[in-house]
């Protein structure tokens, strides 16, 4: 429900997927926050589950280093051996998740 039309996949590899977020008119951005829209942190996890066909049951660690705004391109990279997923923008880490 939250993810409908939120992003488009622009590149897909075995361990990495690049997406482009929708504009500020998407309901996710309208709710968080109307005058300064940012992507809610929990939505990253929903995107990761959908992109990599995962069922995340435990979040061991989550680190966010900056905000994500509409229209940005994000790259999610998964390291299956360590259960770590990185989210980067222009090669700069913006979020890191350790899951199981």
Where are these regions (language model features)?
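Catalytic strand-loop segment that frames the active site of acyl-thioester-processing enzymes
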Residues: 1-35
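HotDog/MaoC-like acyl-thioester-processing domains
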Residues: 12, 79-100
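Beta-strand secondary-structure signal
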Residues: 18, 75-77, 84
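Active-site beta-strand->loop segment that positions catalytic residues and contacts the acyl thioester
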Residues: 58-79
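Hydrophobic residues in beta-strands and at strand termini
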Residues: 21-22, 64, 99
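Active-site helix/loop of acyl-thioester processing domains in fatty-acid/polyketide metabolism
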Residues: 38-56
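Short, glycine/charged-rich beta-strand-loop motifs at protein surfaces that mediate ligand recognition
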Residues: 33-37, 63-64
């Amino acid at each position: 429900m939250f993810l409908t039309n939120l992003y488009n996949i622009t590149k897909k590899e075995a361990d990495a997927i690049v997406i482009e977020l929708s504009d500020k008119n998407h309901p996710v951005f309208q709710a968080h926050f109307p005058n300064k829209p940012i992507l809610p942190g929990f939505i990253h996890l929903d995107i990761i589950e959908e992109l990599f066909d995962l069922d995340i049951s435990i979040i061991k660690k989550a680190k966010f280093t900056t905000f994500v705004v509409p229209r940005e391109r994000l790259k999610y990279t998964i390291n299956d051996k360590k259960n770590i997923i990185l989210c980067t923008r222009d090669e700069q880490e913006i979020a890191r998740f350790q899951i199981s």
